[in-house]
C-alpha cells in the first residue's frame, strides 16, 4: 500500500510540473510572437467579421478573437534545419488553464484488501490447527469456538493416525455377520424375571482383570434383548386376554409382581480406555462413542450391533493397554540410556563398581519382572476362581429366592382360589360381607411380599458395598508398590450413590492418592531412613553455613552415634529415633506427629515424606469410615 501511494504521489507531481512547464512555454511563445522589430511589418487586425465556424453565418467582434499571431515568414533561421519536428505545445483551454487534472483513481484496493484478508485468515487458521494438534488446552478452545475447527483438527489427526499405523484398516472385516433372522426372533430366556441391574453391579464389584460388562457390552446387550422379549411377550399375552376379560370378568392371577423393578436400558455402554493420553487414541475413542450414541438412539440397532460393538470395545481397550505398555518400555529404555551416558563421564576409579552395580541392577530388575509376572498370573488365576465361586453362589442364592417367591405365589393363588370357592358357597347363605375381609388379607399378603423383596434387595446392595470396600483394602494391602485403585473406588461410589457418608469419605481422599496409588509401609520406612540421613546432616549446619561447615557436617554425620529409643529430648536425633521406632511398630500417625515437631531445615527436608504419610493416613481413615457405614447398614437391615 505504501509503494502504491508513493507512485500515485509521484504521478501527481509529474503531471503538475508538466502542466506548469507547458504553461510557461506557451507564455514565452506568446511573448516572442508578440514582439515586433523595426524591420517587420506591423500586424494589422482584420476588420472583416470573423465567422464562428465555417458552417455558421453568425459573426463575432474582433475583440473576442485570441491575439495569437503567426510568426512572419521573412524571419531568418538561426540554426541548421532538422528533420525532427518540434513538440507541439498543448493547447490550453482558457477556462481550465490553471486547474490541474484530477488524480487517477486507485484501482484494485478492494481486491488487495480481500486478498490480504484471505491470506491472513488462512495463515491464522493453519497456525490454529497446528497449535491445536500440539496443545490440549488450545485444542479444546479451537474446536469449540472456531468454525469448522473440529473437522479440520480431526482430518489432520486421522491423516497422522493412518501415517503412523498404515495397517489399521486390516481388522475392519473381522466382525462376524449378523443374521437378521436370529435378531428378529422373540424368545423368553430362562432368567427373564431377574433384574439386569443386580448382575451388572455385582460384576463391577469384582476383580478388574476378569472379563465382564466393564470390558465388553455383550452381556448388557443380551440382557437388554431378553428383557425386551419378555416385555413384548407379555404385551401380546395381554392383548389376547383382553376380549376374554370383557366377556367374563374373572379374577386373573397376579403376574405383575414378577416383572423387573427396573426397565432394561436401551443404550449401549460407552468406551472408557484408562490412561489414554495419546491424542489419536482419545480421538478414536470419541468417534467410537459417537457411533455408540447414534446406535443407542435406535432400540433395534442397539440390540443388533451389541456384539460387534463389544468386540470393537475390547480391541480399543487392548490397544490402549498396548500403547501404555509401549510408552512405559520406551521411558524405561530412555532412562537406562541416560544412566549409561552419565556413567561414562564418572571417574575411572568408580567405573568398574558402576558397571558391577548396573549389571546387578539389571539382574534384579529382570528377577523382579519375572516375579511380578508370576505373581500377577497367580493373582489373576485366584481372582478368576474367586469370581467364579461368587458368581455361582450368587446364582444359587438368586435361584433359591426365585423358587421361594414362586412357591409363595403358588400358595397364595391356591389360598385365594380356596377362599373364592368358600365365598361362592357362602354367598348362597347370604354371607357376602366376608369378601372384603378376604381382599384385605390378600392385600396384606401382597404388601408383606413386597416388603420382603425390598429387604432382600437392600441386603444385596449392602453386601455388594462391603465386598467393594474389601476389594479396595485388599488392593492397598497386597500391593508391593504404589498402585492406583480408581476402578475399585468407582465401584464403591456407584454402589453407595445414595449414601452421603460414603460420598463424603470418597471426596476427602486426595485425587493423587487413588490415581497414582499410595506408598506401602516398607516404602515409607525406606524413604524415612534416607530422609533421616539428610536431616541429620542438616541439623549440624548453622544458619550461615559455608563449604567448610558442610564438609564438617558430612563427616560428623558419619561418626555420630545414634541415641537410645527411650530418649525424651526434643532435638533432631531424638525425634528421628522415636519416629523410626514408631514406624517399625506400625504407628504411622504417631510417627507423623513426631516428624511434624521438627523445625527449620529438618522440617523442610521431611516435608515430602510427611505429605506421603498424610495421604496414606487419609486413605486409611476414609476406608475405616466406609467400612463402618457398611456395617451400620447391615445392622439397619437386620433390625
Swiss-Prot record:
Question: Which terms in the GO cellular component ontology are assigned?
Answer: MICOS complex
Query: Which parts of the sequence lie on the Mitochondrial matrix side of the lipid bilayer?
Result: 39-112
In the UniProt record, the transit peptide is located at 1-38
In which broad location class does this protein mainly occur, judging by the first location in its UniProt entry? Answer: mitochondrion
Q: What are the start and end residues of every segment in region (Disordered)?
A: 34-106, 168-264
Where are stretches of biased composition, namely Pro residues? 83-92
What InterPro entries is this protein classified in?
Answer: MIC60
| Keyword Chloroplast in annotation | no
Question: Which biological process terms from the Gene Ontology are attached to this UniProt entry?
Answer: cristae formation
- Tell me yes or no: is Transmembrane helix among this UniProt entry's keywords: yes
Q: Which residues form a coiled coil?
A: 309-447
Q: Subunit structure of this entry?
A: Component of the mitochondrial contact site and cristae organizing system (MICOS) complex.
Output this protein's name. Answer: MICOS complex subunit MIC60
Organism of this sequence = Talaromyces stipitatus (strain ATCC 10500 / CBS 375.48 / QM 6759 / NRRL 1006)
What phylogenetic lineage does the species belong to? Answer: Eukaryota, Fungi, Dikarya, Ascomycota, Pezizomycotina
